[in-house]
Amino acid sequence: LRAWIHEEAGGRRWRISARSFFQNRPAGVDALVDVVGAMVADLAPTPGGPMVDAYAGVGIFADTVGVGRTVTAVERGKTSLADARVNLAARIKDGTVRIAPSAVEQWKPTPAEVVVADPARAGLDRDGVRVLMKCQPDLFVLVGCDHSSFARDAALLVRAGLRLERLVVVDLFPGTSHVEPVGAF
Protein backbone atom coordinates (compact mmCIF):
# COMPACT_ATOMS: atom_id res chain seq x y z
CA LEU A 1 0.00 0.00 0.00
CA ARG A 2 1.45 3.35 -1.09
CA ALA A 3 0.73 6.19 1.33
CA TRP A 4 1.64 9.09 -0.95
CA ILE A 5 0.64 10.79 -4.17
CA HIS A 6 2.51 12.84 -6.73
CA GLU A 7 1.51 16.38 -7.72
CA GLU A 8 2.84 18.61 -10.49
CA ALA A 9 3.55 22.14 -9.28
CA GLY A 10 6.28 24.73 -9.47
CA GLY A 11 7.56 23.19 -12.68
CA ARG A 12 8.24 19.73 -11.26
CA ARG A 13 6.78 16.62 -9.66
CA TRP A 14 6.45 16.32 -5.86
CA ARG A 15 5.90 13.35 -3.58
CA ILE A 16 3.36 14.14 -0.89
CA SER A 17 2.49 11.66 1.85
CA ALA A 18 -0.99 11.39 3.29
CA ARG A 19 0.06 13.20 6.49
CA SER A 20 2.24 15.88 4.85
CA PHE A 21 0.94 19.37 4.21
CA PHE A 22 0.53 20.52 0.61
CA GLN A 23 -1.73 23.22 -0.79
CA ASN A 24 -5.00 21.71 -1.99
CA ARG A 25 -4.50 23.11 -5.51
CA PRO A 26 -1.25 22.83 -7.49
CA ALA A 27 -2.19 26.16 -9.11
CA GLY A 28 -1.99 27.68 -5.62
CA VAL A 29 1.53 26.32 -5.21
CA ASP A 30 2.44 27.80 -8.60
CA ALA A 31 1.08 31.20 -7.52
CA LEU A 32 3.05 31.17 -4.26
CA VAL A 33 6.25 30.04 -5.99
CA ASP A 34 5.83 32.83 -8.56
CA VAL A 35 5.23 35.53 -5.93
CA VAL A 36 7.98 34.40 -3.54
CA GLY A 37 10.38 33.80 -6.44
CA ALA A 38 9.80 37.31 -7.82
CA MET A 39 10.40 38.85 -4.39
CA VAL A 40 13.67 36.97 -3.96
CA ALA A 41 14.81 37.72 -7.52
CA ASP A 42 13.97 41.43 -7.20
CA LEU A 43 15.01 42.15 -3.61
CA ALA A 44 17.82 39.78 -2.57
CA PRO A 45 21.16 41.57 -2.72
CA THR A 46 22.94 38.75 -4.58
CA PRO A 47 21.57 35.99 -6.80
CA GLY A 48 23.30 33.06 -5.10
CA GLY A 49 23.53 33.76 -1.38
CA PRO A 50 22.49 31.18 1.23
CA MET A 51 18.80 30.71 1.99
CA VAL A 52 16.77 29.25 4.85
CA ASP A 53 13.47 27.59 3.97
CA ALA A 54 11.70 27.66 7.35
CA TYR A 55 8.71 25.37 7.81
CA ALA A 56 9.94 23.72 4.62
CA GLY A 57 7.30 21.01 4.37
CA VAL A 58 8.01 18.75 1.39
CA GLY A 59 10.65 21.15 0.01
CA ILE A 60 8.70 23.40 -2.36
CA PHE A 61 10.61 26.66 -1.82
CA ALA A 62 13.96 24.93 -1.32
CA ASP A 63 13.78 23.41 -4.80
CA THR A 64 12.12 26.26 -6.69
CA VAL A 65 13.04 29.65 -5.24
CA GLY A 66 16.22 28.15 -3.76
CA VAL A 67 17.68 26.91 -7.04
CA GLY A 68 21.12 28.48 -7.45
CA ARG A 69 21.49 28.96 -3.69
CA THR A 70 22.63 26.75 -0.85
CA VAL A 71 19.53 26.07 1.22
CA THR A 72 18.89 24.92 4.76
CA ALA A 73 15.39 23.43 4.92
CA VAL A 74 14.03 23.47 8.48
CA GLU A 75 11.08 21.14 9.14
CA ARG A 76 9.82 19.14 12.12
CA GLY A 77 7.04 16.96 10.64
CA LYS A 78 8.17 13.36 10.19
CA THR A 79 6.22 12.66 6.99
CA SER A 80 7.12 16.04 5.51
CA LEU A 81 10.78 15.34 6.30
CA ALA A 82 10.57 11.96 4.57
CA ASP A 83 8.98 13.57 1.51
CA ALA A 84 11.51 16.41 1.50
CA ARG A 85 14.37 13.90 1.53
CA VAL A 86 12.88 12.25 -1.57
CA ASN A 87 11.97 15.52 -3.31
CA LEU A 88 15.33 17.13 -2.59
CA ALA A 89 17.51 14.02 -2.99
CA ALA A 90 19.63 15.33 -5.88
CA ARG A 91 20.32 18.63 -4.12
CA ILE A 92 21.08 16.91 -0.83
CA LYS A 93 23.53 14.65 -2.66
CA ASP A 94 25.30 17.57 -4.37
CA GLY A 95 25.45 19.52 -1.09
CA THR A 96 23.26 22.46 -2.13
CA VAL A 97 20.46 21.55 0.31
CA ARG A 98 20.80 20.54 3.94
CA ILE A 99 17.77 19.39 5.90
CA ALA A 100 17.52 20.44 9.54
CA PRO A 101 15.00 18.12 11.23
CA SER A 102 13.81 20.52 13.90
CA ALA A 103 11.06 22.83 14.97
CA VAL A 104 12.09 26.31 13.85
CA GLU A 105 11.78 27.57 17.43
CA GLN A 106 14.40 25.02 18.62
CA TRP A 107 16.70 25.14 15.59
CA LYS A 108 20.24 26.50 15.90
CA PRO A 109 20.22 29.21 13.21
CA THR A 110 22.90 29.69 10.58
CA PRO A 111 23.61 32.92 8.67
CA ALA A 112 21.51 33.34 5.54
CA GLU A 113 21.03 36.13 3.05
CA VAL A 114 17.41 35.09 2.47
CA VAL A 115 14.84 33.57 4.82
CA VAL A 116 11.59 32.24 3.38
CA ALA A 117 9.11 31.29 6.11
CA ASP A 118 5.78 29.59 5.40
CA PRO A 119 4.44 28.66 8.84
CA ALA A 120 1.09 27.07 9.68
CA ARG A 121 -1.89 29.27 10.54
CA ALA A 122 -0.53 30.00 14.03
CA GLY A 123 2.33 31.90 12.35
CA LEU A 124 5.86 32.53 13.57
CA ASP A 125 5.08 34.19 16.89
CA ARG A 126 7.86 35.66 19.04
CA ASP A 127 10.01 32.54 19.23
CA GLY A 128 10.00 31.93 15.48
CA VAL A 129 10.88 35.56 14.76
CA ARG A 130 13.61 35.53 17.43
CA VAL A 131 15.29 32.43 15.99
CA LEU A 132 14.98 33.39 12.32
CA MET A 133 16.30 36.91 12.92
CA LYS A 134 19.51 35.29 14.22
CA CYS A 135 20.13 34.28 10.58
CA GLN A 136 20.72 38.01 9.96
CA PRO A 137 18.82 37.96 6.65
CA ASP A 138 19.02 40.76 4.11
CA LEU A 139 15.61 39.62 2.86
CA PHE A 140 12.86 37.93 4.86
CA VAL A 141 9.85 36.63 2.92
CA LEU A 142 6.86 35.67 5.06
CA VAL A 143 3.97 33.64 3.66
CA GLY A 144 0.90 33.97 5.87
CA CYS A 145 -1.76 31.26 6.05
CA ASP A 146 -3.86 33.54 8.26
CA HIS A 147 -4.09 37.31 7.92
CA SER A 148 -4.26 37.90 11.69
CA SER A 149 -1.12 35.92 12.51
CA PHE A 150 0.59 37.49 9.47
CA ALA A 151 -0.18 40.99 10.82
CA ARG A 152 1.15 40.06 14.27
CA ASP A 153 4.31 38.51 12.78
CA ALA A 154 4.84 41.47 10.42
CA ALA A 155 4.72 43.79 13.45
CA LEU A 156 7.26 41.57 15.25
CA LEU A 157 9.57 41.67 12.21
CA VAL A 158 9.30 45.46 12.04
CA ARG A 159 10.08 45.71 15.77
CA ALA A 160 13.12 43.50 15.10
CA GLY A 161 14.42 46.11 12.64
CA LEU A 162 13.01 45.03 9.28
CA ARG A 163 10.80 47.10 6.99
CA LEU A 164 7.96 45.83 4.83
CA GLU A 165 9.13 46.40 1.25
CA ARG A 166 6.45 44.57 -0.69
CA LEU A 167 3.10 42.94 0.07
CA VAL A 168 1.17 40.69 -2.30
CA VAL A 169 -2.15 39.04 -1.48
CA VAL A 170 -2.57 35.65 -3.17
CA ASP A 171 -6.04 34.19 -3.76
CA LEU A 172 -5.35 30.49 -3.22
CA PHE A 173 -8.98 29.54 -2.78
CA PRO A 174 -11.08 31.27 -5.46
CA GLY A 175 -14.70 31.77 -4.48
CA THR A 176 -13.86 32.01 -0.76
CA SER A 177 -12.76 34.85 1.49
CA HIS A 178 -9.47 33.13 2.31
CA VAL A 179 -6.37 34.80 0.92
CA GLU A 180 -2.69 34.45 1.81
CA PRO A 181 -0.57 37.56 2.30
CA VAL A 182 3.09 37.34 1.25
CA GLY A 183 5.41 40.03 2.56
CA ALA A 184 9.00 40.88 1.71
CA PHE A 185 10.86 42.58 4.56
Task: Give the predicted meaning of each segment.
Residues L1-F185:
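Rossmann-like S-adenosyl-L-methionine
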